């Protein structure tokens, strides 16, 4: 269905098994869209999607991987660049977080722990909104006009966390035909 003549060429990218599992469990309406498991190579996979003339791409992944996109990091392996807590802290600071909240974020061991800290500070929504805007910016830069792209973030502990502006648009279009 995603590759039929006359329809936009659509693709879902999932950085790992968590993303694949989330797609099957929480987004069954998208089962006819081709899915590529990217591993840590999100930027390279986006480049291949452009070379293959896909027109619409949605990344679906765990916040622990996709938060790195907010910093323009397109190879998400922890040996290449980690900075999950640093990016969460930076966006929390932009949203008015206290020094104590920022310190707690910097010392958190996981992104789920960061979500707990943000919940306690009643800052999860604005911080995720800021992160999603930054992710959208970096995805658009990497796609360089070759295709529309967005991202869906989730946590195994907290479930759906949000989606970028373009992901929302694309998913609405995909569900409606």
Regions flagged by a language model, labelled:
Residues 1-55, 65-66, 70-177:
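N-terminal loops that bind phosphate or other acidic moieties
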């Amino acid at each position: 269905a995603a590759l039929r003549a006359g329809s936009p060429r659509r693709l879902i990218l999932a950085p790992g098994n968590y993303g694949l599992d989330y797609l099957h469990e929480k987004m069954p309406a998208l089962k006819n869209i081709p899915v590529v498991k990217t591993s840590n190579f999100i930027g390279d996979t986006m480049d291949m999607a452009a070379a293959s003339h896909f027109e619409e791409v949605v990344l679906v992944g765990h916040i622990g991987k996709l938060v790195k996109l907010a910093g323009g990091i397109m190879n998400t392996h922890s040996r290449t660049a980690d900075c999950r807590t640093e990016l969460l802290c930076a966006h929390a600071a932009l949203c008015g977080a206290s020094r104590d909240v920022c310190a707690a974020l910097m010392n958190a061991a996981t992104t789920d722990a960061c979500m707990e800290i943000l919940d306690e500070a009643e800052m999860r929504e604005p911080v995720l909104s800021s992160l999603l805007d930054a992710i959208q910016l970096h995805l658009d830069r990497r796609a360089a006009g070759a295709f529309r792209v967005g991202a869906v973030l989730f946590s195994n502990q907290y479930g759906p966390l949000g989606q970028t502006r373009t992901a929302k648009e694309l998913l609405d279009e995909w569900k409606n035909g």
